[in-house]
């Protein structure tokens, strides 16, 4: 009798372990977008590809919301964690996209680009209340970067960069752009190396 229970428990455990990888990589259906906002933490990796796709690598759609608003129909807003998520909740999202124009992080978290993206005409980047945007792998002719209340942006701008920091933060840039900057309340805008 005890052996049957043990065997049943092992079979159940094995079934759960086999199901975990599938659950951990959920495709999230979304309409087309060219802007992303990450709210409340987590990690988003951008990869270049001809077909746009959002994959949830860690986390759950039970706790994380992927929102497209009528007022901004081309922006994907990712709310990392609702009120019910566990204390140690870990969110990781991979987005494959042909291109993106606007990225924002608020309340912590990280958005980074990986791989090779074709050069963009213009990027708009904003961090509010902590977090990081690292798009060094995504070259652009021009960029606007703003940090408010802490955080950092790493950007590859070739011709023009408008950089603003309010209340602390860092903006690092690669390339040789014409720089227009405003810093109030601490922070720095510096060439990367």
List each model region and its residues.
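N-terminal signal peptide c-region/cleavage motif recognized by signal peptidases
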Residues: 19-21
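Acidic (Asp/Glu) and glycine-rich low-complexity loops/linkers
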Residues: 2, 23-106, 110-126, 137-141, ...
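Short cationic/low-complexity microdomains
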Residues: 151-174
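Bacterial N-terminal signal peptides that target proteins for export
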Residues: 2-11
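Periodic glycine anchor positions in long extracellular repeat architectures
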Residues: 41, 107-109, 129-131, 149-151, ...
């Amino acid at each position: 009798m005890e052996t049957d229970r043990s065997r049943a428990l092992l079979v159940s455990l094995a079934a759960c372990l086999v199901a975990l990888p599938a659950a951990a990589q959920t495709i999230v259906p979304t309409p087309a977008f060219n802007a992303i906002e990450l709210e409340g933490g987590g990690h988003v990796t951008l990869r270049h590809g001809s077909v746009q796709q959002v994959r949830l690598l860690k986390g759950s759609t039970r706790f994380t919301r992927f929102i497209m608003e009528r007022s901004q129909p081309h922006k994907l807003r990712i709310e990392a964690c609702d009120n019910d998520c566990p204390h140690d909740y870990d969110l990781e999202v991979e987005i494959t996209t042909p291109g993106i124009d606007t990225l924002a992080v608020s309340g912590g978290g990280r958005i980074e680009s990986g791989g090779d993206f074709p050069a963009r005409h213009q990027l708009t980047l904003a961090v509010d209340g902590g977090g990081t945007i690292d798009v060094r792998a995504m070259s652009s002719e021009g960029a606007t970067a703003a940090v408010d209340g802490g955080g950092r942006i790493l950007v590859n701008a070739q011709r023009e960069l408008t950089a603003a920091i309010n209340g602390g933060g860092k903006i690092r840039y690669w390339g040789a752009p014409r720089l227009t900057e405003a810093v109030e309340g601490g922070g720095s805008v510096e060439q990367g190396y």
